[in-house]
A protein has these predicted regions:
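Flexible, polar/low-complexity N-terminal or interdomain linker segments that lie immediately upstream
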Residues: 208-258
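Feature for soluble, non-membrane regions of globular proteins
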Residues: 1-218
Length: 258
C-alpha cells in the first residue's frame, strides 16, 4: 500500500511569527516530496529479483530508511506546532509565558534534566549547533530506560532505537530560511512560541504506556472549523449565523487541505 500524504496537522495561518507561505512550502515540497520519493523507492524494491546487484538493493534499503524517517519526523514536527492560540489562563497548561515549559511537562522531565530550564538550555543549544547545517533535534522518551533524552537525528535516520520522539524540531534550512534567513536562533525562539504542548504531553503518555504515538488529526481542532463554499451556502440558506474569520483559495489537486 502506498504511503499517503497526511493532512497537514496545523493550520498555517494560526502560527505566530511563522508565515503561512513557509509552512505550506515546507509541507508541500519537502514533506510531500519525501512521501512521493518513498513510494517510488518501494516500487523499485517490489520489482527486485535474483539478478538485482547487491549494492543496488543495499542502496535502496538505505534510501527507504532515510525517507521513512523524513516522512515520520515531518509529520511529528507539524503535529507539535499550533499551540500559540491554544493556551491562556484557562488552558490548564499552567504556563504564564509562551516561551516557558508548561508545568505538566516540567514535572515530567525534571528528574532527567534537573529542571525545565536545564532541559531547554540543552535542547536550544543542540538546535543552535545545527545552524547552517542540517538535521533534527528531538526530545525522546526511552521506553527501555524509562527516561528522556535530547538527541540529534541527521539524515533522518539517527536516533536511539528504543526512543519515541515526543518533541521534534526541524533544523534543515528549508524549515526556516524563507522567513528567518540565516538567523536560526530567531527561528528556534519562534518555534518555542508555537509548540503545541498538549500534543507533546499526549505523546509522552503514549510512550510511557508502550502505545503508538497518536496521530495529530487536524479534524479534532473544532474551535476553528473549515467549511467548503457549498457547506457555507447551505448554512446561510438555512438561516444559521455564520462568522467568517478567514477565507482563502485552495487547489484540491495539489494537496489535502483542512
Amino acid at each position: 500500500m502506498p504511503q499517503e500524504i497526511a493532512p497537514i496537522a496545523v493550520r498555517p495561518s494560526t502560527l505566530n511569527g511563522i508565515s503561512e507561505q513557509m509552512v505550506v512550502s515546507h509541507y508541500e515540497n519537502n514533506y510531500g516530496d519525501a512521501v512521493r520519493t518513498l513510494n517510488a523507492v518501494r516500487r523499485e524494491l517490489a520489482a527486485i529479483d535474483a539478478g538485482t546487484p547487491p549494492y543496488r538493493l543495499r542502496g535502496l534499503k538505505r534510501e527507504e530508511l532515510s525517507l521513512m524517517g523524513s516522512v515520520a519526523l515531518h509529520e511529528l514536527y507539524f503535529g507539535n506546532l499550533g499551540g500559540f492560540r491554544r493556551a491562556g489562563p484557562h488552558s490548564g497548561l499552567g504556563r504564564p509565558d509562551w516561551h516557558e515549559v508548561p508545568d505538566a511537562l516540567a514535572a515530567e522531565i525534571a528528574t532527567d534534566f534537573g529542571s525545565a530550564s536545564a532541559w531547554r538550555r540543552e535542547f536550544v543549544g543542540t538546535a543552535q549547533s545545527l545552524a547552517g547545517g542540517s538535521g533534527w533535534v528531538l526530545l525522546t522518551y526511552s521506553r527501555r530506560q524509562k527516561r528522556f533524552w535530547n538527541q540529534i537525528a541527521t539524515d533522518h535516520t539517527q536516533a536511539a532505537v528504543d526512543a519515541a520522539p515526543v518533541l521534534v524540531l526541524d533544523m534543515y534550512e528549508h524549515a526556516y530560511q524563507m522567513d528567518f534567513g540565516a538567523n536560526a536562533t530567531a527561528y528556534i525562539d519562534t518555534f518555542f512560541r508555537n509548540i503545541n504542548w498538549e500534543a507533546v504531553l499526549k505523546r509522552i503518555e503514549a510512550a510511557r504506556n508502550d502505545q503508538p504515538l497518536p496521530n495529530e488529526d487536524p479534524s479534532s481542532t473544532k474551535d476553528m472549523p473549515s467549511l467548503s463554499v457549498e457547506e457555507l451556502a447551505a448554512q446561510i440558506a438555512n438561516g444559521s449565523g455564520v462568522q467568517i474569520v478567514d477565507a482563502r483559495q485552495r487547489e484540491p489537486c495539489r494537496a489535502t487541505w483542512i
